[in-house]
């Protein structure tokens, strides 16, 4: 589908990458884990971690009765859990989503500096102006957005239900604005045939996967199935044996007959994917060709900020201003409307909504 003449221009944004956390010794890790486990009990808190956080963080969430999942399921788990405090190991929009669903709870994050290129690349002032310029369009936004952008939308979607919702809207003759991920939007447009005005954002991790390098790797492992998240470029998606959300890719590794998988998404997913498919070999998809350099190198730099030291600090610091998530109540109520619309639609399909990045 050719780009709409009304679509915003693709801008090259030099995202300010955070410094990598200082590695901890085994003794330090053990001390922090013990402290976190005790503090979770004392503070009546539960830890939820995203699939893209480091394996030791995902393991800690599981060990302490929390969960490892995508951002919406993390928020729903926290809403339904009896704990009064929710520690969200992920990026900022995930903490906001948790607060939208659980306004009465204290939502803490290891650091509020952990953000997302999709969020940064879709500032509310510019996105709202784009929507205002097309008042006859239904606004559909990916869950990987700020609370303010969600509040401006008619629908919020995850990658596991985006196709069904866009098909539904298209069947009703609705004109659609899609934001912010252009690759996911293009994939959905191709699958559904829907005409959509695209916001031109992207995920820095998935945008770096390269089709030529993937083709070279496939020659090395001809028996491997290629699993691709639809936030990847179209040339990479075209090579996939399975395309899907985080949870859908994990399911594919578990159920497909192949013994090897080349995985084009954040390598943090390998922890749960290997749990689901313990006898299978997982291979990182390449983020560049021969001699090429990568910036994210298949791991989100902001997800990497969710270390043990930062998690312990979120629970022990007396000053919560660098950890607690607040969402203005009017904004929260507005953002809840398109989220609820998606969940209600999912009920009509009798499907569980999971799977955003």
Curated annotation (Swiss-Prot):
Upper lineage ranks? Bacteria, Pseudomonadati, Pseudomonadota, Gammaproteobacteria, Alteromonadales
Q: Which SUPFAM superfamilies match?
A: NadA-like (SSF142754)
Give, as one word, the top-level EC class.
transferase
Q: How is the cofactor bound?
A: Binds 1 [4Fe-4S] cluster per subunit.
Positions with a binding annotation for [4Fe-4S] cluster: 116, 203, 300
NCBIfam families linked to this entry: nadA, PRK09375.1-1, PRK09375.1-2
One biological process term in Gene Ontology: 'de novo' NAD biosynthetic process from L-aspartate
Main function = Catalyzes the condensation of iminoaspartate with dihydroxyacetone phosphate to form quinolinate.
The family annotation for this protein states: Belongs to the quinolinate synthase family. Type 1 subfamily.
- Tell me the residue numbers annotated for binding iminosuccinate: 50, 71, 142-144, 159, 229-231, 246
**Organism for this UniProt entry:** Shewanella sp. (strain MR-7)
List cofactor names only: [4Fe-4S] cluster
Reaction(s) catalysed by this chain's protein: iminosuccinate + dihydroxyacetone phosphate = quinolinate + phosphate + 2 H2O + H(+)
Might you give the EC number(s) for this enzyme? 2.5.1.72
> Where is this chain's protein located in or outside the cell?
Cytoplasm
Could you tell me what this protein is called? Quinolinate synthase
Q: Which UniProt keywords apply?
A: 4Fe-4S, Cytoplasm, Iron, Iron-sulfur, Metal-binding, Pyridine nucleotide biosynthesis, Transferase
Entry-linked InterPro entries: NadA, NadA_sf, Quinolinate_synth_A_type1
Which terms in the Gene Ontology molecular function aspect does this entry carry?
4 iron, 4 sulfur cluster binding; metal ion binding; quinolinate synthetase A activity
Cellular component annotations (GO), alphabetically ordered: cytosol
Q: Which gene encodes it?
A: nadA
Q: In which pathway does it act?
A: Cofactor biosynthesis; NAD(+) biosynthesis; quinolinate from iminoaspartate: step 1/1
| Stored Pfam families | NadA
């Amino acid at each position: 589908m050719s780009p709409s003449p009304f679509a915003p221009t693709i801008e090259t944004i030099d995202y300010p990458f955070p410094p990598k956390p200082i590695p901890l010794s085994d003794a330090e890790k053990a001390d922090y884990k013990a402290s976190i486990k005790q503090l979770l009990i004392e503070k009546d808190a539960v830890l939820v971690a995203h699939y893209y956080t480091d394996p030791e963080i995902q393991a800690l969430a599981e060990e302490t009765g929390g969960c490892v999942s995508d951002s919406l399921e993390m928020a729903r788990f926290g809403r339904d859990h009896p704990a009064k405090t929710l520690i969200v190991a992920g990026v900022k929009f995930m903490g906001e989503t948790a607060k939208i669903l659980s306004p009465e709870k204290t939502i803490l994050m290891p650091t509020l500096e952990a953000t997302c290129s999709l969020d940064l690349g879709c500032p509310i002032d510019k996105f709202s102006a784009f929507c205002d310029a097309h008042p006859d369009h239904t606004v559909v936004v990916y869950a990987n957005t700020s609370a303010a952008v969600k509040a401006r939308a008619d629908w919020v979607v995850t990658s596991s239900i985006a196709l069904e919702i866009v098909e539904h809207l298209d069947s009703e003759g609705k004109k659609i604005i899609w934001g912010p991920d252009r690759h996911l939007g293009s994939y959905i447009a191709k699958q559904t045939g829907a005409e959509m005005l695209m916001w031109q954002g992207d995920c820095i991790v998935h945008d770096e996967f390269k089709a030529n390098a993937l083709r070279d790797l496939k020659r090395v492992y001809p028996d491997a199935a290629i699993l691709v998240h639809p936030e990847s470029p179209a040339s990479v998606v075209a090579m996939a044996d399975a395309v899907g959300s985080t949870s859908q890719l994990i399911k594919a590794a578990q159920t497909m007959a192949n013994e090897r998988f080349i995985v084009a998404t954040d390598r943090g997913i390998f922890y749960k994917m290997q749990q689901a498919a313990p006898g299978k070999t997982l291979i990182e998809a390449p983020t560049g060709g021969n001699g090429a350099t990568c910036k994210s190198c298949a791991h989100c730099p902001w997800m990497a900020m969710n270390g043990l030291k930062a998690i312990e600090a979120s629970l022990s610091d007396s000053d919560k201003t660098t950890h607690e998530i607040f969402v203005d109540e009017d904004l929260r109520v507005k953002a809840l409307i398109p989220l609820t619309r998606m969940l209600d639609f999912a009920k009509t399909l009798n499907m569980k909504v999971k799977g955003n990045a």
